[in-house]
Amino acid sequence: MFIISGRTMLKKAQQEGYAVPAFNIHNLETLQVVVETAAELRSPLIVAGTPGTFSYAGVGNIVAIAAELAKSWNHPLAVHLDHHEKLADIKMKVAAGVRSVMIDGSHFPFADNIALVKSVVDYCHRYDVSVEAELGRLGGQEDDLIVDGKDALYTHPEQAREFVEKTGIDSLAIAIGTAHGLYTAEPKLDFERLTEIRQRVDVPLVLHGASGLPTRDITRAISLGICKVNVATELKIAFSDALKNYLTQHAEASDPRHYMIPAKAAMKEVVRKVIADCGCEGKL
């Protein structure tokens, strides 16, 4: 089996003090880059897609390509549903072979968030599918979801304890000052809050919105309990900037087998850096 649950790899990361990178992908080329690079560095890997990505590329296509790449590189990985909100959608994708899920009910009141997440956990655990949920809200934009900065909410440590106990989730995404998208100024992460959450919660903790974070912040967050680091925007920008630059310099280019090469190379450098920041090279 090359498509696996995220549960075991996150528990190992928690025990050994590193983080597993979750890279958001969009198509064949971005999948190739993250699997190839992780395999070369023997890094654990989570390949993530938002609802928009699965709608664009097709869940069956993503699972099949990921499985074939994992097999060819002899590199097990998790295909992960990022920021999914509907149980019916999750059921369909689990049936298609996904084994790692994030249910996002963070926009609901606390009790409603618990009820939604528990329904997903009850279903997914029957099929050995790991479940991540979010408590608190990150600002910024993910797919079509836009959260204004004033609506972003930090995770409350005591609520985190209750949330984990009542839902039975496998990992918890927390809000400590990161945001989706690129930062216009260097964020100030609430490491004290992270420490307080870690003291109350025994499941692996997840950091969303890591694109553009300084290495020192990522490594400190990992030292305080973060076990999974999500990166999306930074990958897209590296890929698209290199592609645009190549096509600007080679106006006659028409073969995607050629003009995708520099785009993939630029994205690969970001993947290598994130793996280094996570301290997970050789940890497969």
Curated annotation (Swiss-Prot):
Its EC number is 4.1.2.40. Pathway: Carbohydrate metabolism; D-tagatose 6-phosphate degradation; D-glyceraldehyde 3-phosphate and glycerone phosphate from D-tagatose 6-phosphate: step 2/2. This is D-tagatose-1,6-bisphosphate aldolase subunit GatY. It comes from Salmonella schwarzengrund (strain CVM19633). One of its GO terms (biological process) is D-tagatose 6-phosphate catabolic process. One of its GO terms (molecular function) is zinc ion binding. Dihydroxyacetone phosphate binds at residues 181, 209-211, 230-233. GO terms for cellular component: cytosol. It holds the Pfam family F_bP_aldolase. Belongs to the class II fructose-bisphosphate aldolase family. TagBP aldolase GatY subfamily. PANTHER family: D-TAGATOSE-1,6-BISPHOSPHATE ALDOLASE, D-TAGATOSE-1,6-BISPHOSPHATE ALDOLASE SUBUNIT GATY-RELATED. Disulfide bonds: none annotated. Binds 1 zinc ion per subunit. It catalyses: D-tagatofuranose 1,6-bisphosphate = D-glyceraldehyde 3-phosphate + dihydroxyacetone phosphate.
